[in-house]
């Protein structure tokens, strides 16, 4: 798999658009033991103790392209992170941080963690 700068830009824009369009409950922070992020059809979970920005791109790419292999997802994540300008990364992080804050604030206000059965997205490896 090869991605030129135009394709990388499209992936970035699609990921940013997805962050903007999903409800705050779609993005969750939690401590994880053996992974840094998980992608389900219902939400994306990120370990807040790890590299959130690359992990968020990685999990969003799993959501956007469930047919891609893990190596293709890692490649796309690396290309986006290394091709984006600091302003593009900051813009992505701002929208993601706003969603994460709203979700965590709602959980705190309600006094409990949101829990539900999840169906993991299956993808080729």
List the predicted regions and their residue ranges:
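Active-site recognition of the HExxH zinc-binding catalytic motif
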Residues: 54-66
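Metalloprotease/metallohydrolase-associated module, dominated by Zn2+-dependent proteases
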Residues: 1-50, 66-125
């Amino acid at each position: 798999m090869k991605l030129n700068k135009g394709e990388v830009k499209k992936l970035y824009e699609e990921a940013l658009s997805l962050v903007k369009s999903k409800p705050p409950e779609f993005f969750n922070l939690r401590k994880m033991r053996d992974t840094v992020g998980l992608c389900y059809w219902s939400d994306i979970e990120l370990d807040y103790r790890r590299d959130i920005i690359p992990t968020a791109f990685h999990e969003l790419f799993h959501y956007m392209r469930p047919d891609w292999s893990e190596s293709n997802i890692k490649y796309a994540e690396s290309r986006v992170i290394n091709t984006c300008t600091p302003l593009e990364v900051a813009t992505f992080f701002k929208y993601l941080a706003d969603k994460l804050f709203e979700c965590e604030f709602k959980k705190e206000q309600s006094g409990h963690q949101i829990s539900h059965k999840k169906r993991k997205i299956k993808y080729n490896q």
